[in-house]
Amino acid sequence: MWFSRKQVVKPPPDGSRAQPGQVTTKSRGDAAESAAQVFLARAGLIPVESNYRTPGRGGGEIDLVMRTPDGTLVFVEVRQRSGASHGGAAASISPAKQQRIIFAARHYLMRFASPPPCRFDVVLVHGGPGQGPVENGRLEWLPAAFDAS
């Protein structure tokens, strides 16, 4: 009887587990956020920050912070779903998710002596695997999709 040694494959130094050329959920999400930022910039919004995170555990994240020409800060949540089997991208923004975004926005606004007006927009990216959000033009922008009240 012979025994083979178990091979241990170490993850790449960047911490990802993806193989070269493999499309991951994170890479699809990053592409969706980039496409949304370009889309909103073409619509006249000015990029301020991306992937803003509150410090510590249990906080929130804001995908994009944009500014309108009149100075309103726009906190943007980008959601991508390949299908509508569970309600699509819009259905994935639960009240709990909205509260985490609002928490992060309040934290972000603490840097201002006098906070500017703000709103919460959503950009939905529709499309399945292999369907890039930019090429097929399936972005849906929902200005003032929810509020902090």
UniProtKB/Swiss-Prot annotation:
Gene3D superfamilies: 3.40.1350.10. Pfam families: UPF0102. This is UPF0102 protein Bpro_0391. NCBIfam families: PRK12497.1-3, YraN family protein. Belongs to the UPF0102 family. It comes from the Bacteria. CDD domains: PoNe_Nuclease. Residues 1-30 are annotated as: Disordered. GO terms for molecular function: nucleic acid binding.
